[in-house]
Design a protein with these regions (language model features):
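Surface-exposed helix-capping loop/turn segments at secondary-structure junctions
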Residues: 58-61, 104-114, 133-138, 301
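Non-catalytic C-terminal accessory modules of carbohydrate-active enzymes
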Residues: 181-182, 196, 214, 227-396
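Extended, well-ordered alpha-helical scaffold segments
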Residues: 35-54, 94, 98-130, 168-185, ...
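A general alpha-helix detector
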Residues: 24, 101, 158-161, 227
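A short small-residue
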Residues: 27, 78-82, 101-102
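Aromatic-rich carbohydrate-recognition surfaces in CAZymes
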Residues: 1-65, 72, 88-96, 119, ...
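Extended glycan-interaction surfaces of carbohydrate-active proteins
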Residues: 1-13, 54-87, 127-220, 253-275, ...
Length: 396
């Protein structure tokens, strides 16, 4: 899948585009149950996976890519601002999900040979990933493996996407805690830890550096809020996740473009301020979509699978919510959802599927998460990035 297509040509610099195409195609089928859509796209699914297996994987099954071919894609004068080649952790996660989604679609198409090959490739990938990427002493999932096989030690949020590749649940819980403490500010998830020598405290600070140098090296990206909240909710920490969710709701309702979330924010507030300023695109689709995804799929817990004729509802609401009423379109029907006086009433009308309601269970506090809260700015008087000032920094 190209990153850009216009009259001048086609630009391929997105290693995540093709995996996401297959992953979201499967997701659409779960919500719609439209098998005619599957028949239409299945040849493209086969092509996308088989050609990647044949031409773009290494001996361990990892998907290979160039330095600026992940979502951290900025280049200035042809030089990547945050090089992640050639095996970024989130790309391996997306590749794994593409393989498993493809195997599921193959089974639905009665294509047993492809289903078996793709599933086996996914299992092999996950086995190698846990061995090669997980530093359990440092509670770190390496951001990427370099072309020479050495791991990159920069602390970035991409590791939160990789949990499906890792079996050790205790390790994943501890990684979640550390990511929140190092990267998750009250205004969003930073792209790089503030103790890194490449950290840039504000997105735009043209007296000292070009904004592209800060873009993925400290700047907050609101789209990563989704996975940060999701991981907390999965481990029963919805109260912590809710604080970030509420902060984003405040932005959507009272700041910037009303009803939307911005692309970015500064990691550290400006001098004299207590809250970081917004930056980047004032209305960013994936910032908004991730906020909504977490609300529907994890706080409300609505996860349809019309290909198997089921809709799972597993709510994990914060204590602050004592009453709500909503409805969600699923397939040809509507799911009506009410919560009041501690009781849930969920019913599906207009679609032939079984609703499985999994009620929340009281659980003892998890000591791993005790005391975990937002990362707080620890500003320095002088940052290494301030030393990069030159005339080019004034040119946008």
């Amino acid at each position: 899948i190209p990153n850009r297509a216009n009259l001048e040509g086609i630009l391929y610099n997105t290693a995540d585009g093709t995996p996401r195409y297959v992953i979201e195609a499967e997701e659409l089928l779960r919500y719609s149950g439209d098998r005619s859509f599957l028949r239409d796209i299945y040849p493209s699914v086969v092509l996308s996976i088989d050609q990647s297996l044949r031409h773009h994987t290494d001996e361990k099954g990892y998907l290979l890519h160039a330095d600026a071919d992940t979502w951290m894609d900025v280049k200035r004068n042809g030089i990547p601002g945050s090089p992640r080649g050639n095996r970024a952790n989130d790309i391996q996660y997306l590749w794994y999900k593409q393989l498993e989604a493809g195997a599921h679609l193959a089974r639905l198409m009665d294509d047993a040979p492809h289903a078996e090959v793709w599933h086996e490739a996914a299992v092999r990938l996950a086995r190698n990933f846990e061995a090669d990427y997980c530093n359990k002493d440092s509670l770190l999932i390496y951001d990427h493996l370099n072309a020479d096989g050495t791991p990159d030690l920069q602390y970035r949020p991409n590791q939160l996407y990789c949990f499906e590749l890792i079996a050790d649940d205790d390790f994943k819980q501890r990684v979640t805690c550390r990511v929140w403490e190092e990267l998750v500010y009250p205004w969003g998830v930073a792209s790089l830890a503030q103790w890194d020598l490449q950290f840039h405290p504000q997105h735009e600070n043209w007296h000292y550096y070009h904004k592209d140098d800060a873009y993925h090296n400290g700047t907050v990206w609101l789209w990563n809020n989704g996975i940060a909240m999701q991981r907390m909710i999965e481990y029963g920490q919805q109260e912590t996740a809710w604080k970030l969710f509420q902060n984003m709701n405040h932005q959507a309702l009272h700041e910037g473009a009303v009803g939307s979330l911005s692309e970015n924010a500064d990691a550290h507030p400006r001098e004299g301020k207590t809250w970081a300023g917004r930056s980047g695109t004032f209305l960013q689709a994936w910032s908004n979509s991730e906020q909504l995804r977490v609300w529907y799929q994890y706080f409300l817990g609505i996860r349809p699978d019309l290909m198997s004729g089921t809709v799972t509802v597993e709510p994990k609401l914060p204590a602050e919510i004592t009453e709500l009423q909503t409805s969600v379109k699923i397939g040809r029907g509507t799911l009506y959802y009410t919560y009041k006086d501690g009781k849930f009433d969920v019913r599906l009308e207009g679609e032939d599927a079984k609703v499985n309601l999994i009620l929340p269970q009281a659980a003892a506090p998890n000591p791993i998460f005790q005391g975990v809260d937002f990362c707080q700015p620890r500003p320095l008087e002088h940052y290494p990035c301030f030393d990069t000032y030159h005339e080019e920094a004034l040119t946008y």
